[in-house]
């Protein structure tokens, strides 16, 4: 029986579907469409009426749909190092034409060779096992084992059975149907990997790169020199967008987009703040699912309305003393880092079993950009988990721990995000010293499942539970 969803959650899903549907339709009409980093000022593109897709959002979706490993491997096969970000590898493979595909058709025959990407027929007419001795159906997903194929290679084939079989084998979910870009928008306030990633896409497709460089900020504020530097880049970006669209910049439309983005951000932060209630009216894990909206549509009024509707639903849960969490809250934890999208069920299962509700999420409120003028917009976009000093990063998190009544911290040492993971050992020490709460870390990856070990994760979660219980005993809880 399908899980019922609330009107607010459904509205959020509809917004994301609309963004990608309109993106594809714009491309089909012959309009220029782009790809954008998640923290590029969306207000600019929105004010020009440009349709853009978000490779980070796409990569997370591809990974969650179990194609992260094969897409990462495809990128490695064409020369990208497996040390770089999993999102980048998936996106670079996608930009090169690779798509997730089924190895076999419904009758158990090979559609394509998993090693060469070419069609491979079974000489005996039917296959029970593939070339590696694996069953036709993956027992974990109950789906055919996945591989990749290349859309450019398929397009070059003559019309016929092989071309049809390979086209039909391509995975059809939404994240696999983002059209190729005519320009890219990059802001490296997230990390410097973003810069080379988007440069590579622009070079491969011979398209414009609109770049906004945000300096690392070692202070507790954004100084005026950085504001002037970034504002000058916004002026350049506007001129580039005028060239792409053939339109003049419209300040009134820009102002409206800024109002929409602020309204969305405030509603999003309000949703996040409901985790301060004890017990929380929802499971903080849900914030990861809702982030697609705040990334792809924060400049749209529909996103603001959807988050406001969700906030009203959460307010009602608080009044009634109910929750949408599927378990009783026994401990409240902060999840540090980006989730392992390919392994969400593995992440959630031991949390549910131990009654651990995630009531602190660093990643989610980082997309709540609130400002009153252009200088404040610049300052808002300067703040990201990887673009500020460790002192400011600790202060943010310790404020979240206090406000959201966190009992312990679970840290994801993310192989894909080394800047974020690099300073976490020191942060863990600070949390224990300053806040008196236990922490535990586990190894993983936001997109490549090969870097996640379920047994290690379960052991670390159990250790965190025992440490929190010991802490409770000391406090006489």
From Swiss-Prot:
UniProt keyword annotation of Ribonucleoprotein present: no
Cofactor comment text: Binds 1 [4Fe-4S] cluster per heterodimer. Binds 1 FMN per heterodimer.
Cofactors named for this entry: [4Fe-4S] cluster; FMN; Mg(2+)
InterPro entries: FldB/FldC_alpha/beta (IPR010327)
A Gene Ontology term for the protein's cellular component: cytoplasm
Ways its activity is controlled: Activated by the HgdC. Reversibly inactivated by oxidants such as 2-nitrophenol, 3-nitrophenol, 4-nitrophenol, 4-nitrobenzoate, carbonyl cyanide 4-(trifluoromethoxy)phenylhydrazone (FCCP) and chloramphenicol. Irreversibly inactivated by oxidants such as hydroxylamine and nitrite.
Localization terms from the record: Cytoplasm
Enzyme class: lyase
One Gene Ontology biological process: glutamate catabolic process via 2-hydroxyglutarate
Annotated function: Involved in the fermentation of L-glutamate via the hydroxyglutarate pathway. Catalyzes the reversible syn-elimination of water from (R)-2-hydroxyglutaryl-CoA to yield (E)-glutaconyl-CoA. The dehydration mechanism involves a transient one electron reduction of the thioester from (R)-2-hydroxyglutaryl-CoA, generating a ketyl radical. Prior to (E)-glutaconyl-CoA formation, the ketyl radical is subsequently reoxidized by electron transfer back to the HgdA-HgdB complex (CompD) to avoid change in oxidation state of the substrate.
Subunit relationships: The (R)-2-hydroxyglutaryl-CoA dehydratase enzyme system is a heterodimer composed of an alpha subunit (HgdA) and a beta subunit (HgdB).
Protein name: (R)-2-hydroxyglutaryl-CoA dehydratase, subunit alpha
Lineage: Bacteria, Bacillati, Bacillota, Negativicutes, Acidaminococcales
């Amino acid at each position: 029986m399908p899980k019922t969803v609330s009107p607010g959650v459904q509205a959020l899903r509809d917004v994301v579907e609309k963004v990608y549907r309109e993106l594809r339709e714009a491309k089909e009409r012959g309009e220029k469409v782009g790809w954008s980093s998640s923290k590029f000022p969306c207000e600019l593109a929105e004010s020009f009426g440009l349709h853009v897709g978000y490779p980070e959002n796409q990569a997370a979706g591809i990974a969650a749909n179990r194609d992260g490993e094969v897409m990462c491997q495809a990128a490695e096969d064409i020369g990208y190092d497996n040390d770089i970000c999993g999102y980048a590898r998936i996106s670079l493979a996608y930009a090169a034409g690779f798509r997730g595909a089924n190895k076999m058709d419904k009758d158990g025959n090979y559609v394509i060779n998993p090693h060469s990407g070419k069609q491979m027929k079974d000489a005996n007419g039917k296959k029970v096992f593939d070339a590696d001795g694996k069953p036709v159906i993956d027992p974990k997903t109950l789906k055919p084992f996945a591989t990749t194929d290349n859309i450019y290679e398929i397009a070059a084939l003559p019309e016929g059975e092989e071309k049809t079989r390979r086209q039909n084998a391509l995975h059809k979910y939404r994240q696999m149907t983002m059209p190729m870009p005519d320009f890219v928008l990059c802001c490296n306030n997230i990390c410097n990997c973003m810069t080379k990633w988007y440069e590579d896409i622009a070079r491969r497709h011979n398209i414009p790169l609109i770049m906004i460089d945000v300096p690392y900020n070692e202070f507790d504020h954004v100084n005026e020199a950085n504001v002037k530097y970034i504002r000058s880049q916004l002026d350049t970006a506007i001129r580039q967008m005028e060239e792409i669209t053939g339109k003049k910049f419209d300040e009134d439309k820009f102002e409206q987009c800024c109002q929409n983005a602020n309204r969305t951000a405030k509603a999003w932060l309000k949703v996040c703040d409901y985790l301060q209630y004890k017990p929380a009216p929802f499971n903080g894990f849900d914030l990861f699912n809702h982030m697609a909206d705040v990334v792809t549509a924060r400049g749209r009024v529909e996103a603001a309305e959807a988050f406001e509707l969700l906030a009203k639903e959460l307010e009602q849960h608080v009044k009634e003393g109910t929750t949408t969490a599927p378990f009783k809250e026994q401990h409240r934890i902060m999840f540090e880092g980006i989730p392992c999208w390919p392994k969400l069920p593995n992440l959630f299962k031991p949390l549910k079993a131990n009654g651990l509700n995630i009531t602190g999420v660093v990643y989610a409120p980082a997309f709540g950009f609130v400002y009153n003028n252009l200088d404040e917009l610049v300052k808002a976009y300067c703040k990201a988990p990887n673009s500020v000093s460790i002192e400011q990063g600790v202060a943010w998190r310790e404020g979240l721990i206090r406000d959201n009544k966190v009992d312990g911290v679970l840290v994801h040492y993310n192989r894909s995000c080394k800047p974020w993971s690099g300073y976490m050992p020191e942060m863990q020490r600070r949390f224990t010293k300053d806040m008196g709460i236990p922490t535990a870390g586990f190894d993983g990856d936001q997109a490549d499942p090969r870097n996640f070990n379920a047994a290690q994760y379960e052991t670390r979660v159990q250790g965190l539970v025992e440490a929190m219980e010991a802490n409770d005993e000391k406090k006489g809880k």
